[in-house]
């Protein structure tokens, strides 16, 4: 309790030299530079009053250093200039032109005793590494190498979003929020795209024109950061604080109470709903587990790869931005938005120190502004009318509607082969839907368009416009399938039946062993296995053991019974006891499960042959393997919900019967926070909805089940089958 407050210490211990600017400042501070000339007022940050570093534009039209604005918004929620409300995730990186102007500012080398070089700001770091005698004299290069070997990226050189303080994490994350090819003036993210640290030579620092020596700080700046540090310390001590304590605070807390668990940042808000976002995650060990579970894949109605569960001690939890239900669209630039489950898992398991993910958090219950925006996003042909006739009110049109990030309105993303729209032949991909049955959708949403289509009896009147010239690919925000949640084949794809992800067949194996000899295998699963009830399965086979010598029982086999004793509903402890007590003659009934290899094309760089096969000791069952097991092995549970005042149960379903794809199970795709399904806590993404109030969902079409769920009142019993997602 008598520990001094570091923020108030008049003589703090010197910080290590920064390899970007050559100054000794803490990771919470911007870089310091000495400029040869006065900086133009338009390139000055209105918070620190110095040249912009990593400039960030607010919606109200002002520009600040990313770190300055992030620190300011820790306590405030408005723009410092005009005091209009500002949310960090709504801010955008400044244009390439602004960044180029900043990078060309002339600065002097801070090591004036050894070097008198004058060079552009963006070249200073390279100068330190290659030709600066001062940097060598002060051990800057050695210090950088030592920090790299120690796996410590906080030497003021890199604002990595996952390893530094939460203020820097938020700042770095903003630079990754856009991934928008085709824009005339995209956000400046060259360092992110090139795979370099965010605060590299392209990311510049703050001016320090008044300082003659390289290690001095102005009194005003010190006072400013003391206030910020005190505010952050207060946040760390509150239950609602969403930031993680720094290394000094952690060490002090651990010395006082060793039982306090490690606190991870809660930075969920940095990924906005309904927008495709790119993030970068660092791992000191390239092979460190992500500690998440994944569901989904193109062979299921979920289509996308979705995070089912995040474990508290893993890389993703330490990063603090992702949530269960988030959709992973790309992995290190590789598109996995519509690939088989096992293919996506193989990509995510590739060792790498920097993992780049493009993710989508679906928009939930957010009303969109209908303010008028000029329709000037590119020339389009005159609008035309399309009338589609449904054979029944429940029939789907067979189109997928999405919204674009850079243009308002509703757009056709895909037309399902054989659907109503496809048979009519007039609608095409990228068409913009201006109106449905007289309702203006020029600034509408795909959700409202879907409601209008579903409310139509038989005749759907659409007003559509078509762009004159195809633009470069746009990024879409998904709104769900109009055609029952099932993805249609892309252009040129063959509409062939999908192969099962795994095949099963039963086998009976008899082995002999000495009375004191072990069978030589390790099993997992069992009733009440952590959070799931699972069959007993073989994790590994000991080389040279009884099972290994016989060769018929393999890793991944499901054990059904031993000498006539059923293992389908026993715990792992009970199963091990039964196996150990078996006599010399052992008869094993097992289910062999063979998973199909993903046949996707992939480059050698993306999937190195050395990493394609999981080591036997690290084998774990995949989510798609569980889906292919016979129904009698499926442990079902009843979840009782009561509809809340908003009238929503709080989950989204995909799947069901379709004329062209047959019968598919209904999967839970997403769960809305604060709803009955969320509050109950037993329903997860990827769960299968088998029955509602005792009525089986098998063979139902999507519209029928959705209507039934909306009309049910009071106590609702859902029969759920839940399997654990693939662990990474």
Swiss-Prot record:
User: What does the UniProt entry list as the effect of changing residue 182 to A?
Assistant: Slightly affects binding to NUMB protein
Q: Where is the PDZ domain?
A: 278-362, 385-467, 508-593, 638-723
Cellular compartments annotated = Cytoplasm
Task: Mark the residues carrying the PTM Phosphoserine.
Answer: 445
Q: Which GO terms describe its biological process?
A: protein ubiquitination; synapse maturation; ubiquitin-dependent protein catabolic process
The chemistry this enzyme catalyses reads: S-ubiquitinyl-[E2 ubiquitin-conjugating enzyme]-L-cysteine + [acceptor protein]-L-lysine = [E2 ubiquitin-conjugating enzyme]-L-cysteine + N(6)-ubiquitinyl-[acceptor protein]-L-lysine
Give a GO molecular function annotation for the protein.
Answer: ubiquitin-protein transferase activity
What positions carry the motif NPXY motif?
Answer: 185-188
Claim: Oxidoreductase is one of the keywords in the record: no
Q: Where is this region: Interaction with MAGEB18?
A: 186-244
Record's keyword terms, sorted: Cytoplasm, Metal-binding, Phosphoprotein, Repeat, Transferase, Ubl conjugation pathway, Zinc, Zinc-finger
| Cited Pfam families | PDZ (PF00595), zf-C3HC4_3 (PF13920)
Q: What is the effect of changing residue 188 to F?
A: No effect on binding to NUMB protein
* UniProt EC number: 2.3.2.27
A single Gene Ontology CC annotation of this entry is: cytoplasm
User: According to the UniProt record, what happens if one changes residue 184 to A?
Assistant: Slightly affects binding to NUMB protein
Keyword Transferase annotated: yes
Give positions of region: Disordered.
185-220, 481-500
**What happens upon changing residue 185 to A?**
Abolishes binding to NUMB protein
Can you state the subunit structure given in the record?
Interacts with CXADR. Interacts with MAGEB18 and MAGEF1. Interacts with the phosphotyrosine interaction domain of all isoforms of NUMB. IGSF5/JAM4 interacts with isoform 2 through the second PDZ domain, other isoforms may also interact with IGSF5/JAM4.
Domain note: The NPXY motif is required for the interaction with the PID domain of NUMB. It is however not sufficient.
**What's this chain's function?**
E3 ubiquitin-protein ligase that mediates ubiquitination and subsequent proteasomal degradation of NUMB. E3 ubiquitin ligases accept ubiquitin from an E2 ubiquitin-conjugating enzyme in the form of a thioester and then directly transfers the ubiquitin to targeted substrates. Mediates ubiquitination of isoform p66 and isoform p72 of NUMB, but not that of isoform p71 or isoform p65.
Entry protein name: E3 ubiquitin-protein ligase LNX
Q: Which gene encodes it?
A: Lnx1
